[in-house]
Amino acid sequence: MVSNLSQLEEVNVLVSDANWAWPEALRRIFRPRGVNLLVAESASEFVHIIEKKRIHTTIVDMDSEQSNGLATIRIIRIEYPLLPCILLTSTAGKSLLGKALQLDVFSVIDKPVDMHILREQLNRLFLKKYNSSLFGDPPRIRN
């Protein structure tokens, strides 16, 4: 079922915590669009947050110090099999891509993350899943 985000009160994206500037970089994409950024440190925290709030997508770091990204997605899939997940990784080999495909990961993005590519993938995801161009390019002003 496709739902239109214009009917929703809030849009929530849940991401892996990081010891680098990752959350702040995401805020630069999300804040102008009115998207709430929620951060989880572990697989159990991901599930706990998903149980409490409507989450529209997750962005999971394969290289998280707290938990393996694929293991986190596997745990999410137990209770939330349709929740879209994007996986970030510094080592996107065939084995990892095969496992991500088995877990129905929406997209695998290489690290360091190109924020333009991430925004494009979020736009594809939100168009497909929610019929929303929330992450599309801002309209250009013509003179």
Where are these regions (language model features)?
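Conserved phosphotransfer microenvironments
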Residues: 59-76
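Alpha-helical interaction/dimerization surfaces of two-component signaling modules
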Residues: 28-33, 49, 99, 121
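A Lys-centered signature of the CheY-like receiver
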Residues: 111
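Alpha4 helix (beta4-alpha4-beta5 surface) of REC/receiver domains from two-component response regulators
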Residues: 71, 92-108
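Non-catalytic signal-transmission and effector/linker regions of two-component phosphorelay proteins
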Residues: 1-29, 38, 56, 78, ...
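Acidic, metal-coordinating helix/loop segments flanking the phosphotransfer/catalytic sites
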Residues: 39-57
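Conserved phosphotransfer cores of two-component systems
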Residues: 51-53, 76-82, 103
